[in-house]
């Protein structure tokens, strides 16, 4: 708990202030709400989620569609983003972006997701990746032919990577998202790309098979080119006793050295190995480390090698730790320790009273120092290969995962995640009807290792929609969010929310008014 809040709580009790029903926890919760301007830069948080649905319609303002904490303002960037617009990345940087590059989470379907044909008769799929001009709101399609494009990031070497949330989903890398338009992936899982005339286009988009196939969502990439990501899989969905999705990392064969990438052949994503986090029931110096099994979900663990051709099956077979639908994930920008701190959401199922969580893993040596294979029939890791770290006593690369945010009856089913620059506050976005966006404090110098508290700052007013892709620009004072998959019944031809290029639309909203240190 933040020391300021604790001191205030003690002061109020000492002065005889009544704590309703003796509920100290509720009083602390209310104290945080009362100081929301100091800690979150908003006048005050929302007290409740929206409950009365407001359908999408022509002529609306953003505040017709989202309920905002007092002090925040909103405007449409565009009402013409492709329906099912999901995560987004700024281009060419976070500080002064000119465009947002977005994923469209729709299936590749030769019947249901065809919006027409090009002049040469070639099938025109719905959009998969679009760019939005932040000055004009103009929306242009970069790429078609993916299935359920979801996670998207700008890499440290200034390319764009986009991923598919399908069981056999892949990752595709784009050299320059402003230099190409109306390209199509001929076959998923390959780098065969054509333009609107049917001509082959080489060197602009590459499928990255080395990172593997799985149901992608969030990811982050280190300066060296190490990629962290999860598999959005519910436990039991793959059959009896099947684990939930695992947490993976790709370690490139050649790390990025900071050289400007002018060709996709120079990307560190060309080749490498994939490992899955395997929580251990024993500490890193134990003679039985890594010792794994049911009940070991957090704490110190090792990185077991898996087969990128089928990551989910391989992770299960090699006893990687499973979670309940790992979804979005990002590095903590204020982490100052060795390596990286990667935080990700596990959505859970509120209907089953599994309210979800946000976990963070600290990985001190992301690249490792080669591999080590266990040859000891007396331990349950016999025959498995792991990422090595020669600086560790047992020789294994070790990461430590713990829970940062635990869901409850109000904050639950976390889906997306964002860190606010400057403050490092974590924003948690729900996957719910009338979904909320929560702002969560960092952990301070108290006893626990969890957030010091969360407040609600946004609630979607359309019960058919959800907030997604929430992210901050580099100054931490401006946020963007998609109001995804609204019912568009009222958006008739010619209206501001009508179809765009033969495809239904979503709203991209810009939110301003966040204060940092009172400014």
What are these regions (language model features)?
Residues 21-519:
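Sequence/structural signature of beta-propeller domains
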